[in-house]
Regions:
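N-terminal hydrophobic/helix-forming segments and targeting peptides
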Residues: 1-459
Length: 459
């Protein structure tokens, strides 16, 4: 079964919509390089679209009615948006669920040290990375520092044109004979992914003068002392903006497209759909790259607790009503898929691979060898989605992650399926997934948004 290239179907009006969506997407990537920044930007866009913090309804004990738009935030790192439908919540919701964390380097709690005239920040990598990809790149620092007095300082260094950037150094080729004999996963050791941040000594300082200069600069700009690193969350990410890629500008090159490409298109679809019959939900969560753990990951009770609040405000606040709502819901686990790469064709089985420019991808299952750890969607649900996408003239394709036993991966789908709801993975194909700079097709971004709109309206 061959899938058509979406580009060949676009008229001038389609191209205008496509370019507008992708311009907004690039801006979202630039403004959201961490999960906190993504939540902040999502709240801004939601409030502009008329969404109100659910806490306001709870404090005022205000009843929810069809058409109401609310959002809930969990610890500034996860967000759930809802538009109340005309049908009872116990009949289920239509959920788009993506994650907004991405692989990166995290600064350790006691990170700052000086070594032979250089100052470094010690890091611990987050998520699945090829460690050697992170050396000799311009890097930026994003995050927050929480002081003992309760003040929380936002930190972004390396994005403004006048900012310095940072990097992890590498061994010169002339002395790399031994290094290059090592397996790829040990060519650069995790403990060597330390960020070079300074080399100038502070005048009239005898001991650790370079470190002293770094601390002075941090204190001058942010009021940060060395002990404040103990209560900081600082993330090291590639510096620079999302860019159009290719002579034809048909692709996007950017950091964090896994999974912010699906997060953004889910958010846009959520804000676009009006007056749904079934309640709509857009769920953007944290910690997927390390197992969806913690209070802001999908395994927490944030979503379930928020649904309980909605039901209570809608006059259906019983445990049984919550269970019925969850079990009757349908979900697209909006997560990316591996795009077929001709340079690494041996890793893919072409009949069941995702291709650039052919639309959103449906992954009936993910997992590893033998489908281990997978959510395997039901055939009936796949059939229903086929009808929804075809009726909405969405370009879509099906795929597995790669050849059997070559590798594997997982998403939040299996977690949500524990409620008994129908769940399937559905997202955008990505080249160079988990690299510092990933690639997507503008056409697939556009088709994903179309698919998510169709799902919210008709699932």
């Amino acid at each position: 079964m061959e899938r058509k290239t979406a580009w060949n179907e676009y008229k001038k009006k389609d191209m205008k919509k496509l370019e507008k969506l992708n311009a907004g997407y690039r801006a979202f990537l630039d403004n959201g390089k961490t999960e906190r920044e993504c939540v902040k930007e999502s709240v801004r866009q939601a409030e502009e679209a008329g969404y109100v913090n659910l806490d306001t309804y709870v404090k005022e004990n205000r009843a929810l009615k069809p058409g109401d738009k609310v959002y809930a935030v969990c610890m500034k790192k996860a967000i759930a948006l809802f538009q109340i439908g005309t049908r009872p919540l116990t009949e289920g919701t239509n959920i788009l669920g993506a994650h907004i964390d991405s692989p990166r380097l995290d600064v350790k709690q006691n990170p700052l040290y000086e070594d032979n005239g250089f100052t470094y920040l010690d890091t611990h990598y987050y998520g699945g990375i090829k460690k050697w990809q992170w050396v000799t790149l311009p890097l930026a620092i994003h995050g927050v520092v929480a002081k003992k007095n309760g003040e929380v300082v936002d930190v972004v260094i390396g994005e403004d044109d006048n900012d310095p950037v940072f990097c992890v150094t590498d061994l010169l080729i002339h002395l790399s004979r031994e290094q290059q004999t090592k397996p790829a996963n040990t060519v650069v050791e995790g403990e060597n992914l330390d960020l070079l941040i300074g080399s100038q000594p502070l005048e009239e300082t005898e001991k650790e003068a370079v470190k002293a200069m770094t601390l002075k600069l941090l204190n001058d700009k942010y009021g940060i002392e060395e002990e404040d690193f103990l209560s900081a969350e600082l993330e090291i990410v590639p510096a620079g903006k999302a860019r159009e890629l290719g002579m034809d500008a048909s692709m996007i090159l950017a950091y964090g497209q896994d999974d912010r490409v699906c997060a953004y298109t889910s958010l846009v679809a959520m804000l676009e759909v009006e007056a749904p019959e079934k309640t709509s939900c857009c769920l953007l969560v944290d910690k997927e790259e390390i197992g969806s753990v913690g209070a802001t990951g999908m395994q927490s009770h944030f979503f379930e607790n928020t649904m309980a609040e909605l039901l209570a405000l809608a006059g259906e606040g019983t445990e049984l009503a919550l269970r019925r709502c969850l079990a009757s819901s349908r979900m697209l686990s909006s997560d990316v898929s591996a795009a077929f790469d001709p340079l690494y064709a041996a890793a893919f089985e072409k009949k069941n691979a995702a291709f650039f420019g052919k639309g959103i991808v449906i992954n009936k299952f993910t997992g590893a060898g033998g489908k281990s750890g997978s959510n395997d969607a039901n055939a009936e649900y796949v059939g229903a989605l086929r009808a929804i996408f075809d009726d909405a003239k969405v370009n879509w394709q099906t795929a597995e992650l790669g050849k059997v036993d070559v590798g594997g991966g997982g998403t939040i789908a299996y977690i949500m399926s524990l409620y008994g709801m129908e769940v399937i993975d559905s997202g955008v194909p990505v080249l160079s997934m988990h690299a510092p700079w990933e690639v997507t097709s503008k056409a697939d971004v556009y088709e994903a948004k179309k698919a998510y709109v169709a799902f919210l309206k008709n699932a």
